[in-house]
A protein has these predicted regions:
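A Rossmann-like FAD-binding core segment of flavoenzymes
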Residues: 53, 71-135, 140-142, 204-293
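Short hydrophobic core segments
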Residues: 7, 140-153, 185-187, 266-276
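Rossmann-like dinucleotide/flavin-binding elements
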Residues: 1-29, 172-219, 283, 304-343
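Flavin (primarily FAD) binding-site architecture
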Residues: 148-164, 277-289
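Beta1-alpha1 glycine-rich phosphate/pyrophosphate-binding loop at the start
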Residues: 9-85, 194-225, 291-296, 334
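Glycine-rich nucleotide phosphate-binding loop and flanking beta-alpha elements
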Residues: 13, 95, 154-155, 193, ...
Length: 343
């Protein structure tokens, strides 16, 4: 039986685990892959990671400052090993259930929607801790408290148009240098989409023809520096920004766009869609955690100390609605302090 089980080894989970180790709490950090911090691990190679907001003081037993992806991952690997954090790799949580007494009047309603628009409602009775965390390999981990730090990147928003399920549509770019002499279309003009487009167009020797689609003429979700750099690349002829353009359909070798001037069919060998992500709602609700609304992008209901509607299960990081790394790390530190009785 652990005092706390932390699920997910992103910035929030790592910070929580490091604090638990520093305080001498019995703990386990469950990571479904064979490496730490999968979200940052999947960042584009060489990506510069920002440390915003700059005026926020970091509360964590592991370090973080702006720098290259590879440097940050190396620092965290070294420090987690130095803190002797109890990490269990290849440990994906399948379910979390309370094994204590039933909580009177505490029921989680789960609404399921069919494709025809009909919906059904079922109820889950909440139970007190300790919690049994069943892993996909059949193993069960017992813990008095659970911290969910699983983020949202494993649940990307999918394209919805004819041909969206074709194999050349992808939602991740690891290394731009892998792609040569291709017509590539980036869908999404947030920071990830812009960085992917610029990375693919950076080296003329790769001979890629890169377009990035923008439904409007503005870039409201991207950092100013990224927008300026993208516009500069467009002006230099390295890539093309297609404004007021949306995907109508996809077929092998081509993509058809709906534009201000009508339909446009252009060559396309690969589509990289970076259109955001949403909380893994089904899994979270099965844990007895209620969401703030029925909207797909809604986040779980949480107390001021990030405790969910399931007593003893805490939600931190991007899954709690805080995508910035420093915020995530502070939350991991603070939740462990709360669990340890330091309110």
């Amino acid at each position: 039986m652990f005092k706390v089980a932390i699920i997910g080894s992103g910035p929030a989970g790592l910070s929580a685990a490091a604090r638990a180790a520093a305080l001498g709490l019995s703990h386990v950090l469950l990571e479904k892959t064979d490496h730490l911090s999968d979200t940052i691990y999947k960042y584009q190679k060489g990506k510069h990671v920002m440390a915003t907001p700059s005026n926020l003081v970091l509360r964590s037993d592991i370090d973080f400052e702006a720098g290259k992806r590879e440097v940050i991952l190396g620092t965290w690997d070294d420090q987690i090993a130095g803190h002797k954090v109890n990490v269990k790799y290849m440990a994906e949580a399948k379910s979390i259930r309370g094994t204590g007494d039933a909580i009177p009047g505490s029921v989680q309603q789960i609404v399921s929607r069919a494709r025809d628009g009909t919906k059904s409602v079922r109820e889950i009775q909440r139970h007190t801790p300790p919690y049994a965390i069943e892993l996909t390999n059949g193993e069960t981990i017992m813990a008095e408290n659970v911290i969910l730090a699983i983020g949202t990147q494993g649940n990307p928003n999918r394209m919805r148009c004819p041909g969206a399920d074709l194999p050349h549509v992808q939602y991740q770019l690891d290394d731009p240098a892998e792609y040569v002499d291709e017509h590539i279309v980036i869908v999404g003009t947030g920071d990830a989409g812009i960085e992917n487009a610029r990375g693919l167009a950076e080296d003329p020797a790769q001979r890629n023809t890169v377009s990035i689609l923008n439904r409007s003429t503005e870039f409201p979700t991207a950092k100013d520096a990224n927008v300026k750099a993208l516009n500069a690349d467009h002006e230099a002829g390295k890539l093309m920004i297609r404004t007021e353009s949306e995907t109508k359909s996809i077929e092998p070798g081509f993509i058809t766009l709906t534009t201000r001037d009508g339909e446009l069919r252009i060559p396309c060998d690969r589509i990289i869609a970076r259109i955001g992500s949403a909380p893994p709602r089904a899994f979270v609700e099965e844990c007895g955690i209620e969401f703030s609304s029925e909207d797909r992008s809604a986040f779980p209901k949480l107390s001021p100390v990030f405790e969910s509607t399931a007593p003893g299960i805490f939600v931190i990081g991007a899954l709690a609605g805080y995508p910035l790394i420093k915020h995530c790390m502070n939350q991991g530190h603070d939740v462990i302090e709360f669990i340890n009785g330091n309110t």
